[in-house]
Design a protein with these regions (language model features):
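Catalytic-core "active-site belt" of small-molecule-metabolizing enzymes
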Residues: 2-206, 210, 214
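Beta-rich strand-turn-strand
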Residues: 215-220
Length: 221
């Protein structure tokens, strides 16, 4: 299978919410570059959509062994996949996804584009917000390789952005210390902090900015 054929299968899977066998299980070993090339074609095949941001996945090193990955990934978010709720409450129709899961998020909006070809750019923030992402696996039982995940668009389903907050000079440090608890039916399922996100959410943005320079055909932030 070539990149076009793989992208067609992925886009059909997403459109129909129908899972497929991971490409890595079929002996199709993609390089990181090839996987991002597939994801770009997938985005085109899913139809015209304004890209409004990037999601960063697998930023928590503590789960890398669970999913057998060894680095974060990213994928585009479109105007149709992002919703806003100042009340911090939002109902999502899960029938549009294959095997959805929920992840609490720190959402950041950049005031300006960071310098592209540098390891430690200044990150200028416009606002921050709590949010949650519905991540989705087109591969059964969430079993896939790193490049399988990249090819599917970084496992992005949808993002809900909560109430926006102003930023200050202390925001980067404060986000490292912020705590979050995830409940289901009133029962605590998981706890974490901003430090789980590649040592801090703004550190994750710097990682993304660097990563985009290392992969061909990627648009800067």
């Amino acid at each position: 299978m070539n990149i076009e054929e793989i992208a067609s299968e992925v886009s059909n899977s997403i459109s129909l919410a129908k899972q497929i066998e991971p490409f890595s299980k079929r002996g199709l070993v993609l390089s990181i570059q090839e996987a991002y090339d597939v994801a770009k074609v997938v985005r085109q095949k899913l139809g015209p959509a304004e890209i409004v941001g990037q999601k960063i996945g697998f930023t928590n090193r503590n789960i890398w062994n669970i999913y057998e990955v060894d680095e974060p990934i990213w994928g585009p978010m479109t105007k149709s996949s992002v919703s806003y709720s100042d009340s911090n409450f939002y109902k999502v129709d899960l029938n549009q996804f294959c095997e959805p899961r929920i992840e609490p998020e720190v959402v950041v909006c950049l005031k300006q584009k960071p310098e592209f070809n540098t390891d430690n750019p200044e990150i200028s923030l416009d606002w921050i917000a709590p949010g949650f992402e519905i991540v989705d696996s087109i591969y059964p039982n969430w079993k896939f390789s790193l490049t399988d995940a990249i090819a599917s668009g970084g496992l992005h389903g949808s993002l809900v952005v909560g109430k926006k907050f102003k930023v200050s000079d202390d925001t980067e440090k404060d986000l490292i210390d912020v705590k979050v608890s995830l409940y289901r039916n009133g029962r605590l399922e998981e706890e974490g902090s901003g430090a789980n996100v590649l040592d801090g959410p703004i550190s994750a943005v710097r990682f993304l900015n660097r990563g985009l320079t290392k992969i061909k055909n990627q648009d800067p932030l």
